[in-house]
Amino acid sequence: MDIDPYKEFGATVELLSFLPSDFFPSVRDLLDTVSALYREALKSPEHCSPHHTALRQAILCWGELMTLATWVGNNLEDPASRDLVVNYVNTNMGLKIRQLWWFHISCLTFGRETVLEYLVSFGVWIRTPPAYRPPNAPILSTLPETTVVRRRGRSPRRRTPSPRRRRSQSPRRRRSQSRESQC
């Protein structure tokens, strides 16, 4: 059975396959990131989001896979066979778990739409012949920023800028910090 773990999130395995394998951080770095950013939400008995649920399941599966790999490593007599198993797990399973964790962490951090836009942008960039594409690949953290191009001609009338709230004091941010839920 061929199951695409990204389907319900609007992405596909193919869409993530445009990103090279060395793009994804190590399992250790991803676990550290998840722990630093989402530990409370992942441990919470509340349902936070489908991304939290997917991360919980993927972390549990990785733990079970590491238990199995340890058992195989301890019980397989032939060193060549043991190395084959370890290399297979690290190369194939490790890449899949790194992709999965990166996707869900990125969706929680930047938003699903931004991540999908990034995947499409990167896919277009990587498939464009080098002579016709910009030298640098798109960067996920800069995607939400938009460039405003002014028309030529009359300059817009000048106004005194209105006082603005600092971002960190916005009501939305305050509300989310004061909520009792960890999500």
From Swiss-Prot:
Entries under SUPFAM superfamilies matching the protein: Hepatitis B viral capsid (hbcag) (SSF47852)
Motif Bipartite nuclear localization signal: chain residues: 158-175
Gene Ontology biological-process entries: microtubule-dependent intracellular transport of viral material towards nucleus; symbiont entry into host cell; viral penetration into host nucleus
Keywords of the record: Capsid protein, Cytoplasmic inwards viral transport, DNA-binding, Host cytoplasm, Host-virus interaction, Microtubular inwards viral transport, Phosphoprotein, Repeat, RNA-binding, T=4 icosahedral capsid protein, Viral penetration into host nucleus, Virion, Virus entry into host cell
Segments of skewed composition (Basic residues): 149-176
Stretches for region RNA binding: 177-183
One Gene Ontology term, aspect cellular component: T=4 icosahedral viral capsid
Location of the protein in the cell: Virion; Host cytoplasm
Post-translational modification: Phosphorylated by host SRPK1, SRPK2, and maybe protein kinase C or GAPDH. Phosphorylation is critical for pregenomic RNA packaging. Protein kinase C phosphorylation is stimulated by HBx protein and may play a role in transport of the viral genome to the nucleus at the late step during the viral replication cycle.
Name of a matching Pfam family: Hepatitis_core
Sequence repeats: from-to residues: 155-161, 162-169, 170-177
Phosphoserine PTM positions: 155, 162, 170
Annotated region (3 X 8 AA repeats of S-P-R-R-R-[PR]-S-Q), positions in chain: 155-177
GO molecular function: DNA binding; RNA binding; structural molecule activity
Residue span of region Disordered: 136-183
Major location (coarse): virion
Annotated signal sequence range: none
Classification via InterPro entries: Hepatitis_core, Viral_capsid_core_dom_sf_HBV
Gene3D superfamilies per UniProt: Viral capsid, core domain supefamily, Hepatitis B virus
Function: Self assembles to form an icosahedral capsid. Most capsids appear to be large particles with an icosahedral symmetry of T=4 and consist of 240 copies of capsid protein, though a fraction forms smaller T=3 particles consisting of 180 capsid proteins. Entering capsids are transported along microtubules to the nucleus. Phosphorylation of the capsid is thought to induce exposure of nuclear localization signal in the C-terminal portion of the capsid protein that allows binding to the nuclear pore complex via the importin (karyopherin-) alpha and beta.
Subunit structure of this chain's protein: Homodimerizes, then multimerizes. Interacts with cytosol exposed regions of viral L glycoprotein present in the reticulum-to-Golgi compartment. Interacts with human FLNB. Phosphorylated form interacts with host importin alpha; this interaction depends on the exposure of the NLS, which itself depends upon genome maturation and/or phosphorylation of the capsid protein. Interacts with host NUP153.
Family classification: Belongs to the orthohepadnavirus core antigen family.
Listed name of the protein: Capsid protein
Annotated source species: Hepatitis B virus genotype B1 subtype adw (isolate Japan/pJDW233/1988) (HBV-B)
Gene: C
